[in-house]
Amino acid sequence: MRAEIENYVKKIEQSLELLRRSLDVETSAARLAELEELAASPDLWNDQANAQKLLREKSNLEEQLGAYNKIRSNLKDALELEEMAEAENDLEIMQQVEKDLQSLSTIAAKFETECLFSGEADSNNCFLEINAGAGGTESHDWASIMMRMYLRFAERLGFKTEIINMINGEEAGIKSCTIRIIGRRAYGWLKTEAGVHRLVRISPFNAAGKRMTSFASSWVYPEIDDNIAITIEDKDLRIDTFRASGAGGQHVNTTDSAVRITHIPTGTVTQCQSDRSQHKNKAQAMKMLQAKLYELEMQKRTDSVNEQNAAKTDNSWGHQIRSYVLQPYQMVKDLRTDYETSDTKGVLDGDLEEFVSASLAMNAGSKK
C-alpha cells in the first residue's frame, strides 16, 4: 500500500510541476488581478465586444488557477492525513488516503491534458462523423464499434451525446453517423481523433474464420457559438428534404422531415433527421454546416491541410491515425505518436485519454 501511495504522490507532483510551467502560475495570477480590476470598472460595457473578451479571459484564468490550487491543497491534506494514519497505525485511514490520491491523480492528469487546449473553439461542443470504408458488412460493423467507442469516451468525460444522423448497413453495423457531443471542452478532447482507423480481427461474418482488415474514418468539427462569426449566404445553399430512414413500426416517419443542406461553393453537405420537426432538423443541419465550414477554414491555416483533408476522404492504408489489432495479437497503436497499449478491450470501451494526451502533447511540442 505504501508503494502505491508513493507512486500516486509522484504522479501528482509531476503533474503539478508541468501545470505550474504550462500555466506560468505567477504571471497568470498577476494577469488575473489586472483583469479583476478592469472588470470592476464602470466603463467596462462601453465596448461590449471587448468586455466579453475580457470576461472570458478572466473566467478561464479563474478556472485554471482555481483547479491548480485545489489539486495542491488536496495533495497537502492527503499527505497530512497519511502522516497521522502512519503515526496511529490506522490501516483504514491509509486505505482511504490511497483511494483519495488515486482519484486526485486522475483529476490532475485530466487537467494537465486540458491545459494543452489552445484553440479558440476548444471549449465548444463538437460534432463527430464516422464513415465506414470499403469492405461492406465488415467495415459497417467496424464503424458501429467505433461509434460505441466514442460514445463511451464521451460518457467517461461526463459529456452528453446526441445521434444527429445515422445510416444503417444492409446486414450489420452502420454506413455512417453524426454525433453531437455536448460539454465544456468537448472539441478540445476530440479534435485530434480525426482520421482513418484500421481494424484487424477474425471476421465474425466469414464462415472460414479468416483474418480481415477493415477501415473507417472519423472527422471532428466544433459547434460554433456567438463568439465565432461564420457568414453563409442564402444563395450559396441548396436545401433538400426527404423522408427519414428508420426501422419502421409505430414511430416511422411518414413526412419529409429530414433535411440535407449543401454549401455549393465548397460542396460541403450536412443532414439531420433526429427530430420529427423539419424546422428543428433544418436548424441543426445549419449549425453543423457552420461548424464544418469553420473547421475547413482552420485547416487552411495549418501546414498539414492536405494530410487532414485526405484523412477524412480516403479510407485507405496511407492516411491512418491508429491501428487496432485483435488477431493474431492484441495491440492498439497510434501511428502519429507511437503510443500503444495491449488493452484493446479498454480502448474499444472508450479508454482513449492517453491517446488524446499524447497527440495534444506532440502537437504542442511541434508549435514551439
Curated annotation (Swiss-Prot):
Q: How is it modified after translation?
A: Methylated by PrmC. Methylation increases the termination efficiency of RF2.
InterPro entries xref list: PCRF, Pep_chain_release_fac_I, Pep_chain_release_fac_I_sf, PrfB
**Signal peptide bounds:** none
Q: Which UniProt keywords apply?
A: Cytoplasm, Methylation, Protein biosynthesis
Q: Extract the SUPFAM superfamilies matched here.
A: Release factor
At the top level, the lineage of the source is Bacteria
Q: Does the keyword Cytoplasm apply?
A: yes
**A Pfam family:** RF-1
The Gene Ontology CC terms held by the record are:
cytoplasm
Record flagged with keyword Translocase: no
N5-methylglutamine occurs at 250
GO terms assigned for molecular function: translation release factor activity, codon specific
List localization entries: Cytoplasm
> Which family does the record claim for this protein?
Belongs to the prokaryotic/mitochondrial release factor family.
Looking up HAMAP family in the UniProt record yields: Rel_fac_2
Its function? Peptide chain release factor 2 directs the termination of translation in response to the peptide chain termination codons UGA and UAA.
- Name assigned to this protein: Peptide chain release factor 2
The opening ranks of the lineage are: Bacteria, Pseudomonadati, Pseudomonadota, Alphaproteobacteria, Rickettsiales
